[in-house]
């Protein structure tokens, strides 16, 4: 216990983990003032109720910060441009953690607190993501991680503690799903989901229709991109938040964007998670199609080789790093001409290409045609093939006892 800590800023969500933080912090840091910081990431919760809950739990102040637009522009759009997927599957919804940490620091400095606290467990990735960002942004602040300090060892014990302190939580011992929700995705973990051999229960999905219940008619959508960033849906220019919300609704009802995966956590263990990300799935598909039209072969291949590096960086929470800045600089150059329109059909969990166009398209029918043309001289290929395959020919001659004649 640090006796000199008199004021603490807490990253507060109102869920189980952070619901019990306020009384615990006040108990273990005598006379400490707790300030709750709530970020509106589009989680579609009653944030006023969460604010009141924080105050009723003993917080002296509670801030609600609307970061949805900032989240989309400064975090999600760079992610779309990168095309990064962690382990080729995970859509990286926890990219929100550095932004939460940033807002926590801003309020902490304004309020002149001694310490900041978060509700991430000692078994998960979020503790690393939060604390990496906090140390990068405000290394002078003390960091408190109650899950690594208290005697509570399970979610069931946390529920008991909450009830003992009169704190209402949206979780019961029989259905202890741990959910994280923002405008990019919803994640589901815990309970029966911890066993990968068990099929996902029907009560898990919140934003996406089961494929069996999806419409029997396909839906055509049109996405416009400018320099790798989505700017319009169905020929209507929308704000980033409105575009994401609309696309989540459209793609979600068609059963698109559900991932049931086992991922490797940064802290060493494997975890099963169910992720819903309808808009993200569609945007990634459309962006990838447009890149195939607009990027040169060598640029596309180099970018693809760096996507896992970028995904790892985001997954590990290294958003405020020199590496991330360098990768963003490269990606921004690749996106200068990723501008155009992509048409897609949404149908029972499938995203089907239905045409694309770009003023910067590098695809020229006159060159690619299988019909007779006067542009491409096929005889030119012979010299290229001879030079391209020369090393293979020499290797074969040397190791098979051949000669150079």
From Swiss-Prot:
Which biological process, per GO, is one annotated for this protein?
Answer: L-arginine biosynthetic process
Any idea which GO molecular function terms this record carries? Answer: argininosuccinate synthase activity; ATP binding
Q: Matching SUPFAM superfamilies, A to Z?
A: Adenine nucleotide alpha hydrolases-like (SSF52402), Argininosuccinate synthetase, C-terminal domain (SSF69864)
| Positions bound to ATP | 11-19, 119
Instruction: Give its E.C. classification number.
Output: 6.3.4.5
Q: Where in the cell is it found?
A: Cytoplasm
Catalytic activity line of the entry: L-citrulline + L-aspartate + ATP = 2-(N(omega)-L-arginino)succinate + AMP + diphosphate + H(+)
- Assembly and partners? Homotetramer.
Q: Which PANTHER family match?
A: ARGININOSUCCINATE SYNTHASE
- What name is this protein filed under? Argininosuccinate synthase
UniProt source species: Legionella pneumophila (strain Lens)
Tell me the name of the encoding gene.
argG
């Amino acid at each position: 216990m640090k006796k000199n800590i008199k004021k603490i800023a807490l990253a507060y969500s109102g869920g189980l983990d952070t619901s019990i933080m306020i009384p615990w912090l006040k108990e273990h840091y005598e006379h400490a003032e707790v300030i709750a910081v709530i970020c509106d990431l589009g989680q579609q919760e009653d944030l006023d109720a969460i604010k009141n809950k924080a105050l009723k739990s003993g917080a002296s102040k509670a801030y609600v910060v609307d970061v949805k637009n900032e989240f989309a522009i400064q975090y999600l759009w760079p992610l779309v441009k990168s095309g990064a997927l962690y382990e080729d599957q995970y859509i990286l919804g926890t990219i929100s953690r550095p932004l939460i940490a940033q807002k926590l620091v801003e309020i902490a400095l304004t309020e002149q607190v001694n310490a900041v606290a978060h509700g991430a467990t000692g078994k998960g990735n979020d503790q690393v993501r939060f604390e990496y960002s906090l140390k990068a942004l405000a290394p002078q602040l003390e960091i408190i991680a109650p899950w690594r300090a208290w005697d509570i060892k399970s979610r069931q014990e946390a529920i008991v503690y909450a009830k003992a302190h009169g704190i209402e939580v949206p979780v019961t011992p029989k259905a202890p799903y741990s959910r994280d929700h923002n405008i990019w995705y919803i994640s589901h973990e815990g309970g029966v989901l911890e066993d990968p051999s068990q099929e996902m229960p029907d009560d898990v999905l919140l934003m996406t229709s089961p494929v069996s219940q999806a419409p029997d008619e396909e839906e055509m959508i049109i996405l416009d991109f400018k320099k790798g960033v989505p700017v319009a849906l169905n020929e209507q220019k929308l704000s980033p938040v409105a575009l994401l919300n609309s696309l989540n609704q459209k793609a979600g009802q068609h059963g698109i964007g559900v991932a049931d995966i086992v991922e490797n956590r940064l802290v060493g263990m494997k975890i099963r998670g169910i992720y819903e990300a309808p808009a993200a799935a569609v945007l990634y598909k459309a962006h990838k199609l447009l890149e195939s039209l607009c990027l040169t072969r060598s640029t596309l291949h180099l970018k693809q080789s760096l996507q896992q590096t970028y995904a790892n960086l985001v997954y590990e929470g290294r958003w405020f790093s020199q590496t991330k800045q360098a990768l963003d600089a490269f990606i921004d150059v690749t996106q200068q001409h990723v501008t155009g329109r992509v048409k897609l059909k949404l149908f029972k969990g499938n995203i089907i290409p239905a045409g694309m166009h770009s003023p910067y398209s590098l695809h020229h029918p006159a060159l690619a045609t299988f019909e007779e043309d006067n542009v491409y001289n096929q005889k030119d290929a012979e010299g290229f093939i001879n030079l391209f395959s020369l090393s293979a020919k020499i290797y074969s001659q040397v190791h098979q006892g051949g000669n150079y004649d």
